[in-house]
């Protein structure tokens, strides 16, 4: 393709942006799928009052570790409600940290989704202007002269749309999925916090057994 250097640069930038978007999309889909399983196990165990494993290798484990850490730091003078709020606050902070990490890459999808069509349009406008300049210089308005330049220019817009459409769809889906995961974890946190604050002896025996 003998496109103008600027048009060609626009196409390359959009192609690289599209590749980066698909890399983020695939990584996030696989990551969220794994975390969804952790969420289900976390909610089930918290609902049933089972002791959870505080593993630093996964999100649920880090939340549990934060909860157990707050539970161990007990103040005899605090009420059950105060103890529950303190334990839940520690787990929510751990969740918030991981949620921020999971959001990495999503702003890039949003940026590509909103900017790529306009970047492609810029390449198209620039290419059409050059095509008209070439037509004026050659004094030849035949289709064989006009069509290639305009087709190359329009191709920049097409690449922009190809990059933007999946990015927008993925951003909306991943944002929704992330919100649902967060709400599921919050539900588990509330149940676990209640169990830890209410039944201290049960968890104390579990700690001693380990």
Please annotate each region the language model reported.
Residues 10-13, 17-20, 116-119, 123-126, ...:
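Residue-level signal for the membrane-embedded core of alpha-helical transmembrane segments
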Residues 4, 22, 55, 64, ...:
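Residue-level signature of catalytic and energy-coupling elements of molecular machines
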Residues 2-47, 55:
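Transmembrane alpha-helix/interfacial motif
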Residues 153-167:
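Hydrophobic alpha-helical transmembrane segments of polytopic membrane proteins
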Residues 33-142, 169-210:
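Predominantly long cytosolic amphipathic alpha-helical stalk/bundle segments
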Residues 21-28, 163-174:
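Transmembrane alpha-helical segments in integral membrane proteins
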Residues 12-13, 147, 155, 159:
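Alpha-helical transmembrane segments of multi-pass inner-membrane proteins
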Residues 139, 143-153:
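Hydrophobic alpha-helical transmembrane segments and adjacent short intramembrane/lumenal linkers
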């Amino acid at each position: 393709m003998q496109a103008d250097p600027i048009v060609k640069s626009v196409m390359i930038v959009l192609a690289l942006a599209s590749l980066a978007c698909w890399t983020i999309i695939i990584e996030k889909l696989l990551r969220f799928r794994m975390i969804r399983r952790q969420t289900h196990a976390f909610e089930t165990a918290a609902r049933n009052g089972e002791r959870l494993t505080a593993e630093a290798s996964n999100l649920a484990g880090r939340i549990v570790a934060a909860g157990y850490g707050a539970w161990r730091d007990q103040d005899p003078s605090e009420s059950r409600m105060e103890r529950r709020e303190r334990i839940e606050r520690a787990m929510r902070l751990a969740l918030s940290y991981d949620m921020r990490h999971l959001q990495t890459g999503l702003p890039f999808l949003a940026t590509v989704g909103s900017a790529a069509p306009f970047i492609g349009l810029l390449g198209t406008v620039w290419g059409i202007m050059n095509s008209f300049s070439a037509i004026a210089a050659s004094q030849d308005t035949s289709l064989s002269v006009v069509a290639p330049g305009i087709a190359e220019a329009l191709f920049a817009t097409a690449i922009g749309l190809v990059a933007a459409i999946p990015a927008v769809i993925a951003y909306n889906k991943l944002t929704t999925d992330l919100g649902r995961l967060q709400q599921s974890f919050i539900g588990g946190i509330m149940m676990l916090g209640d169990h830890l604050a209410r039944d201290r002896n049960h968890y104390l025996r579990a700690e001693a057994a380990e």
